[in-house]
Every structure is written in C-alpha cells, then in structure tokens.
Amino acid sequence: MRTHFCGLINETLIGHTVTLAGWTDVARNLGGVCFIDLRDHEGIVQITVDSRAIDQNNSELFRVASGLSYEDVLQVEGVVHARHAVNDKIKTGKVEVIATKIKILNKAAPLPFHAHENPGEDIRLKYRYLDLRRPEMQRMQRTRIKLVQALRRHLDMHGFQDIETPILTKATPEGARDFLVPARMHPGEFYALPQSPQLFKQILMVAGFDRYYQIARCFRDEALRADRQLEFTQLDMEFAFVSERDVQDFVEEMIRRVFKEVAGIELDTTFPRMTWKEAMRRFGSDKPDMRINLELIDVAALVADSTFTPFTNAVAHPNGRVAALRIPRGAVLSRKQIDEYAAYTAKYGATGLAYAKLAPTGEITSPIAKFFSEDAFAALLSHIGAEKGDIVFFGAGNYNKVSDFMGALRLKAGKDFALITADWRPLWVTDFPMFEWDEEAQRYVALHHPFTAPAAINDIDELRTHARTALSRGYDMVLNGNEIGGGSIRIHRPEMQRAVFELLGITEDEARAKFGFLLDALNYGAPPHGGIAFGIDRIAALIAGTESIRDVIPFPKTTGAQCLMTDAPSPISEEQLSEIHVITKKLTP
C-alpha cells in the first residue's frame, strides 16, 4: 500500500513518485490550494493539492482533499518536489509531495480531542488509541521499546539465556497481596499471578542454567500511584557462582551502555556505593536523590543541655534522633509557608517541626531559641553551617521516623528552592538490615525478601542471636532518587533458609506448604547465586522525562485500578462463576 514512510521523505527523492499512507494530521483549504500534513509513525510530510494545476478530469482530487477531516486515513500517490517555503520545524520541511491520487481508506468520526492537544488523563485513558497517536506519547513508547531492545542485545551478547517462568503459579507471601485465579479443575483451590519470578529463577540456578534473564510481567494487588501499577514489567536476572560485586559490576556496565545507546546519557564510570545506614543518616532515605546538595546533620550532642522537651526526650531515648536540615536562602519563607512545611512532614510521621531563620541582616528568628543559652544556640547554628538568609529545620523523635520525615522535607525543599541539578546521579545502596521488627505484629519481617542471604553470618545460631543487628547481602541501584533495581545474593543452603523462615514467624509446616519445592531444590546441590531485577517502566519513564510510569505503559490502569478503555474490571456472569466454583456475596456498607 505504500512505497515510503511519510517522515523519511527527503531531498534525495525529488522528482520521484511515491505512495504514502497515514493519518490526516492537519488539512487546510486555502481557496485554490489544499495542504495536508500526512502523518505516520516516522513523522509528517506536507501533501499539496493545487486546483489550478489539475485538469478538469482530475477535479475529483481537489474535492476529496478539501473535504478531509482530522485523523482520516489516507493513501496518497504523488511526486516529491522541493518546497518553496522551508519548514525547519519538521525533518521533511524541505520537500513536499504534489498529490496525483488520494484515496480515503477510512473516515474518522469527530474526535474527543486532537492529537496535538493534551486533555485530562481520564479522557486520554478512555481513548488510549488516540492518545498514543500523539507525538509525545509516540516518543515515550519508542523510548521504552529501544530500552528493552538494548537490554536484550547486551544480555544476549554476554551469554544470558532468556527463559520464561510460569504466570499461573503458587501463592507465596512476597510482601503484597496476590492476584488469585480460581482453578476450575481443582475446586476450592487457586493459582496466583507472580509478584516476581524470584523462586523460579533460583530454581533455574539449581538446574544449572547459570545466567538467566527475562522481561517478566509481574502482578501485585496494591495501592496505585504515579510510579506503581497492578501489573508491571521487570528485567529479571540471576547468576550462579557470583558475589555482590560480580553482579554490581556487570549491571553497572549494562546500565551505562544502555543509557548511552538509548538516550545519549553518559553515566559515571563507576557508581558510588553507600551503606543503607549512611544513606538514612545523611539523607533520610534508602534511595537518596544525590542531585540535591542538602544533608541531614545529627545535632543530639549540641541540644542535650537545652530545655526543649522534644529534643531532650529524643536525646535520652536509645533509639532517638535530633536532626537538622539547612536550606540555603530559605529565610524568605513566611510563617504560613513554614506551617505548610510542618503539615507536609506530619504526613510522614512528624509531630512538630522546629526552625530557625537567619535574616540577611543576621537577625535570628526561632521559637526554640529561648530554650538555649545565646552561646549554645549560636554554636548549634555554626555547627550546622547556617549562614545569613538561610533557614534551618529541626526534627526530633524516633530515629526512623525522624529520618523519614526529614528525608521527605529534604526532597520537597530541593524542588521548591530549585536545588535539583540537571544531571544523572546513580548510586549503589548496600548493607541493608536483614530484618525489621514489626511492633504491631510483634515479629521480624524481611527488609528485602525472605530469600536474601545474611552478610558475614554462616552460623544459624549466630543469626538467631544477632537477628536485630544482622545485615543482608542485598543491594539497590538508585538513580536520581528512584530505586531502579533491587537484588541480593540468595540463601543457597536449606538449613539457613529454614532458620530465616523461623525468624520471620513462618512455622515449619507453613514453610513446607508454601516453599517446600524451594527447600527441596536447595537440598540437591544449589550453587551460590544472586541477581537483580530492574523496573522497566520506571527506567523508561526516567529516560523519557516523565514523572508517571503510566506515560510509558501502552495500556495502564488508573489510580482506581481500572482500565477506562476496556472498562475492566467488569462483572462476570453467574454461569462463568459456577464453572470456576466461585460464589460472590454483597458486603453491607
């Protein structure tokens, strides 16, 4: 139906007859001349129909051209000419096609929005097929496609094997709710959609495949937000006989190469490394945005002699923290704006936010200054590095809570005061705690997942004794404040895996029921192994320059977990429910 793509017509084709096919991007009738911008996936070219240059037998051509509407689907035959008025805004702007034939392949109904408009997200998602025609959406989808292609090429070149793992699998606790699928042939039993291929890729290492990868679809029934979907895509990888550094060095090279190939982005030759403990202390986050040159400063020693109760209580508590955050030029904040910052940090657990403003004149305004001697308060501000025109915020309380809300404040201040530099700052975060203590459940939970190996502990009794302080062999790759990949060295000894299950409150019977197949596999000569999984959606969004992963997913769900285009989820007939042995009941509000 076509000989060339619209966006690839250029000066080398002048004088040649071409056949094109695409959509009517714009159609303009200027009296005796019609100009049509014809669009396909490669771009736009101008089609010209001049009634004055057409003999009487071809007057039908002008009639067709003058009656075109947005998004009509056309086949056009014509001759390539040099344009009199060059359009430097498009790559075909030096040429045009003088049409000799136009065939309407399909008329478009009146549009809910035009391809060059940017309507509300609900409308975009309802008419996703129109939304995806927009040049910006085409660009973002192509970025994703190029990313996946580049990753595959790199892994294939290095001997990795692309192996599929099951979509219908067993429900296992991995941190989020499972999506369950009734098993028609086994009444009362259910499959689960995989939250990740974690256990299968470990079993592939036991099976001797050594280097595995998969572009894997994963499913988690959890609350949605801009960077989270019910179904998402991972680059899943696993290696046998590796250390943490082996995995990290390989994927560093891969990410550097792929970012340069896909988007021309140059990343650091070596990614810096930081322990989880240091990241939380300095930045209040296990995925710090290193583009923001602000750090939390511990000031417990300098406030211990004050009479400000929130500070002294935190200092006295073994798990307390008093941290300060200096914001350059922040003294411009009004009292109302400071209150808004306090309300913002309250969402992250803050019960109050103290501050000190240093006016350009040197005058200090602070509601907590009265709880210090003049010299002590001056020494505190000097230690923090506060200068004229700055504001300093203080947080006090439980160490983890203070880290969380002061870390959130750091990010907000970075955005509000334009302190985020326009570069790319990758980082490895390592040495995560093996476990967290869940006060509500009164038990340990795994910080990464239950299959992560402990660091520097080979003895089970030692792990039991030091569970609260044990570190894991987990690692995350962080880029500009986004965790783009997470992995670990796995447990490969069955007795250690049983001990970890026990510490997590998983009984032996429960472990057999849920993970018996893994424990059995580890019994038969499992090699040391480890790996990592990268979030394709998140990386594509970063490269494409969008804050929402919905923009790089062709058919995403809304934050209400719906597909507005297909109207999913939708009711199922009683007949279908009966076939899968499911009975539903209405819940009273």
Swiss-Prot record:
Superkingdom of this protein's organism = Bacteria
Per the UniProt entry, what are the Gene Ontology biological process annotations, in alphabetical order?
A: aspartyl-tRNA aminoacylation
Please provide the record's keywords in A-Z order.
Aminoacyl-tRNA synthetase, ATP-binding, Cytoplasm, Ligase, Nucleotide-binding, Protein biosynthesis
Q: Does the keyword Nucleotide-binding apply?
A: yes
Instruction: Drop me one GO molecular function for this one.
Output: aspartate-tRNA ligase activity
| Chain positions covered by the region annotation Aspartate | 198-201
Instruction: State which Enzyme Commission number(s) the record gives.
Output: 6.1.1.12
Q: Which residues bind L-aspartate?
A: 174, 220, 448, 490
Q: What residues bind ATP, as annotated?
A: 220-222, 229, 483, 535-538
Xref: SUPFAM superfamilies: Class II aaRS and biotin synthetases, GAD domain-like, Nucleic acid-binding proteins
A GO-annotated cellular component: cytoplasm
Q: Where in the cell is it found?
A: Cytoplasm
HAMAP family for this protein = Asp_tRNA_synth_type1 (MF_00044)
Quaternary arrangement and interactors, per the entry?
A: Homodimer.
Specify the protein name. Answer: Aspartate--tRNA ligase
Q: Specify the species.
A: Xylella fastidiosa (strain Temecula1 / ATCC 700964)
Which gene carries the instructions for this protein?
aspS
